[in-house]
Swiss-Prot record:
Residues 1-11 have a biased composition (Acidic residues). It catalyses: [E2 ubiquitin-conjugating enzyme]-S-ubiquitinyl-L-cysteine + [acceptor protein]-L-lysine = [E2 ubiquitin-conjugating enzyme]-L-cysteine + [acceptor protein]-N(6)-ubiquitinyl-L-lysine. The gene is ari-1. Zn(2+) 4 binds at C251, C254, H259, C264. The lineage of its organism: Eukaryota, Metazoa, Ecdysozoa, Arthropoda, Hexapoda. Changing C223S: In ari-1d; late pupal lethal and adult escapers have a reduced lifespan and thinner bristles. Nuclei in larval muscles (myonuclei) are displaced from the cell membrane, exhibit clustering and morphological defects. The keyword Zinc applies. Zn(2+) 5 binds at C291, C294, C309, C314. Residues 133-201 are annotated as: Important for interaction with Ubc10. This is E3 ubiquitin-protein ligase ariadne-1. One of its GO terms (cellular component) is nucleus.
Length: 503
């Protein structure tokens, strides 16, 4: 806009975590590995991440702009657009700025080079008695018009309507371009602040540019918990366990619940596979077969054994009973009378391979889901344990003495979460000597975890109080130790490249 006002738009509006329609707001999809065993020994306090409120996010955004401008010395709105273009990577922006052709640099970022001031436009507008709005074609005095450095000018009502539509209806923030047809110059935040008077639209705009800032910045991530408005800021980006102020614990790299020992890329594949397969896999296994030629799944909906594949590129005719070609069956439409089983055996072997693959998937899926379902009872279990703690205090035990129960539930939930993700890890793992050691560790931890769960569900009486306390303490310490052993072994395997994968 034709204005020297560089004040930040966000001074008087709230900010928040909402989805943005701007380009470049997709997840950065970090493809990095879990830290090495040596790195994991480092105390978690050494990974100095911060949990930021939306106001702190806005302040952090200002700080980055100010730091960049110490060298750029550009108008603040221009610097904001440039930083957004470079995904808020200040170093990359400065490198390109000082290395590239200046005009080309600003052109790629869709801003006018501020060093090439459009004096002609300013002189034209100052001499004119009236100007024509390029949208509604009204003749208005210059002070009723506004425009960007590209020279396209529109009346205030047209600007307001245009910007409101882009912000509210289309969900655009940092990537709103000039209203002139074919002009790709971006509208800066100061222009929006001066032209948009509707408080609802202003708040929405600030939410969008704040969200864009977080999603573009590889050192920031919104907490994925429902309705949480916090973001986590990290010193460097890698798969790390971060704990939001809302209580949610997640992996910074992918945003999923913390999933040690499985890596982000395998968890992503697993979640997609579960979404695609789990709801219908059991029914498919019981009621369908695959075409022996193209493997398309076919349901038998009548008594006839003569099957015709509906795949337009296949049209294979085969026998439902033996899966062999239908042609040698002659006119025997209802009963398979083939004597030579060679071809049928080949077809059945292929069918069995597919069934075996499905059975393997269901083995790991069912155990994964079992631990997930158990974890969903966490709140109920905490409530039950709280009641037990109160009962124990009635048996002359102090508040401090009964804290072992809460500690036990914490470790139980931690072990269940670890076990849940070990089945994802195991599903993609090829068999070797180290994988057998892993499975032994997994079995040992699972057995101990189930026993701890059983202890916590027992009724507590004055007669068994001492016995239950000793058993719970011994078992949760054992679970904690075995969980640590399992994770250490898996990460040692990552470091020494023991693990090979099926896909």
């Amino acid at each position: 806009m034709d204005s020297d006002n560089d004040n930040d738009f966000c001074d008087n509006v709230d900010s928040g975590n909402v989805s943005s329609g701007d380009d470049g707001d997709d997840d950065f999809g970090m493809e990095v590995d879990l830290p090495s065993s040596a790195d994991r020994q480092m105390d978690q306090d050494d990974y100095q991440y911060k949990v930021l409120t939306t106001d702190e996010i806005v302040q952090h955004q200002r700080e980055i702009i100010d730091e960049a401008n110490l060298l750029l010395k550009l108008p603040t709105p221009t610097t904001r657009i440039l930083l957004n273009h470079f995904k808020w990577d200040k170093e990359k922006l400065l490198e390109k700025y000082f290395d590239d052709n200046t005009d080309e640099f600003f052109k790629c970022a869709h801003v006018i080079n501020p060093f090439n001031a459009t004096e002609a436009i300013k002189q034209k507008t100052s001499r004119s008695q009236c100007e024509e709005c390029e949208i509604c074609f009204s003749q208005l005095p210059p002070d009723s018009m506004a425009g960007l450095e590209c020279g396209h000018r529109f009346c205030m009502p047209c600007w307001h309507e245009y910007l409101s539509t882009k912000i509210v209806a289309e969900g655009l923030g940092q990537t709103i371009s000039c209203a002139a047809h074919g002009c790709d110059i971006l509208v800066d935040d100061v222009t929006v602040a001066n032209l948009v008077t509707d408080a609802r639209v202003r708040v929405k705009y600030q939410q969008l540019i704040t969200n864009s800032f977080v999603e573009c910045n590889q050192l920031l991530r919104w907490c994925p918990s429902v309705d949480c408005t916090y973001a986590v800021k990290v010193p460097y980006a890698e798969p790390r366990r971060v704990h939001c102020k809302c209580g949610h614990v997640f992996c910074f790299a992918c945003g999923e619940n913390w999933h040690d020992p499985v890596k982000c890329r395998w968890l992503k594949k697993w979640i997609k596979k579960c979404d695609d397969d789990s709801e219908t896999s059991n029914w498919i296994a019981a009621n369908t077969k695959e075409c022996p030629r193209c493997s398309v799944t076919i349901e038998k909906d009548g008594g006839c054994n003569h099957m015709v594949c509906k795949n337009q590129n296949c049209k294979n005719e085969f026998c439902w009973v033996c899966l062999g070609s239908w042609e040698p069956h002659g006119s025997s439409w209802y009963n398979c009378n083939r004597y030579d089983e060679d071809e049928a055996k080949t077809a059945r072997d292929a069918q069995e391979k597919l069934r075996s693959s499905l059975a393997r998937y269901l083995h790991y899926y069912n155990r994964y889901m079992n631990h997930m379902q158990s974890m969903k009872f966490e709140n109920k279990l905490y409530a039950s344990v709280k009641q037990k703690m109160e009962e124990m205090q009635q048996h002359n035990m102090s508040w401090i003495e009964v804290q072992f129960l809460k500690k036990a539930v914490d470790i139980l939930c931690q072990c269940r979460q670890t076990l849940m993700y070990t089945y994802v890890f195991a599903y993609y793992l090829k068999k070797n000597n180290q994988s057998m050691i892993f499975e032994d560790n997994q079995k040992d931890l699972e057995s101990a975890t189930e026993m701890l769960s059983e202890y916590l569900e027992r009724d507590i009486t004055s007669e068994n109080l001492a016995d239950i306390k000793q058993k719970v303490q011994d078992k949760y310490r054992y679970c904690e130790k075995r969980c640590s052993v399992l994770l250490k072994h898996v990460h040692e395997g990552y470091d020494k490249e023991w693990w090979e994968y099926t896909e």
